[in-house]
Amino acid sequence: MKYTISVKASPQDSKATKTVIDLIYELLERKHLIERVFFQHDGALQALSTGETAVGQEHLLSLWKSLADLDIELAVCISSAAKRGVSQKSNSLADGFELVGLGQLISAIEASDRYIEVF
């Protein structure tokens, strides 16, 4: 099966973020495909290059980078990113993430068997 995942959770909600990352790895282990991970609303903050987590927690940005290294597309809604100060121009967009329009979410949903939203 092919999945599209929309992440709306802020990186400050590290439990939701870690859960979705674990879900993606579980899906990959079961030989499912990830069409795209789309970050919107406060989820766009996941792509902030200066992303930090609370002491004692795994560095979430490095976990996202590991997924990008597996050729998982990490697409960030350009409108959500702009409202939250995430941009390529200011070098605040982390490596492995790409700014895209909302149409990329729609096309990914159409190409997928399942769509999951994480708040």
Region spans (language model):
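Short, glycine-rich nucleotide/cofactor-binding loops
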Residues: 3-18, 46-52
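Histidine-anchored nucleotide/phosphate-binding helix
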Residues: 16-30, 37
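Short amphipathic alpha-helical segments and helix-helix/interface helices
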Residues: 24-25, 61-65, 106
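Short internal beta-strands
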Residues: 35-41, 74-78
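Short, active-site-adjacent cap segments at secondary-structure transitions
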Residues: 44-47, 83-84
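Short glycine-enriched, charge-decorated loop/helix-capping segments at active-site entrances
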Residues: 50-54, 91-94
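A glycine-rich helix N-cap at a beta->alpha junction
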Residues: 53-80
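C-terminal structural segments of small proteins and small subunits
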Residues: 84-112, 116-117
